[in-house]
Every structure is written in structure tokens, then in C-alpha cells.
Amino acid sequence: HLLQFNKVIKFETRKNAIPFYAFYGCYCGWGGRG
């Protein structure tokens, strides 16, 4: 899942860096593995 998120994030960050990264960043940061 990490690889997928990495690709998606890299692609999406160009459009919605703040909302997208913030959502996944918080989720994964709080211990949301996969």
C-alpha cells in the first residue's frame, strides 16, 4: 500500500498538496498502516 500511496501522493500533491497530503499524512501518521 505504501508504494501505491507514494505514487498517488506524488501525482496528487501537484493538484491538491494540502488536502490530500494532510489527510493521508494524518491518517498514516496516527498509525494507519495500509
Curated annotation (Swiss-Prot):
Belongs to the phospholipase A2 family. Group II subfamily. It is found in: Secreted. InterPro entries: PLipase_A2, PLipase_A2_dom, PLipase_A2_dom_sf. It catalyses: a 1,2-diacyl-sn-glycero-3-phosphocholine + H2O = a 1-acyl-sn-glycero-3-phosphocholine + a fatty acid + H(+). Transmembrane segments: none annotated. This is Phospholipase A2 B1. Keywords: Calcium, Disulfide bond, Hydrolase, Lipid degradation, Lipid metabolism, Metal-binding, Neurotoxin, Presynaptic neurotoxin, Secreted, Toxin. The keyword Cell membrane does not apply. Its cofactor is Ca(2+). Its main location: secreted. Expressed by the venom gland. GO terms for cellular component: extracellular region. Snake venom phospholipase A2 (PLA2) that inhibits neuromuscular transmission by blocking acetylcholine release from the nerve termini. PLA2 catalyzes the calcium-dependent hydrolysis of the 2-acyl groups in 3-sn-phosphoglycerides. It is an enzyme of class 3 (hydrolase). The lineage of its organism: Eukaryota, Metazoa, Chordata, Craniata, Vertebrata. SUPFAM superfamilies: Phospholipase A2, PLA2. Contains seven disulfide bonds. Its EC number is 3.1.1.4. The keyword Magnesium does not apply. It comes from the Eukaryota. GO terms for molecular function: calcium ion binding; phospholipase A2 activity; toxin activity. GO terms for biological process: arachidonate secretion; lipid catabolic process; phospholipid metabolic process. Binds 1 Ca(2+) ion. It holds the Pfam family Phospholip_A2_1.
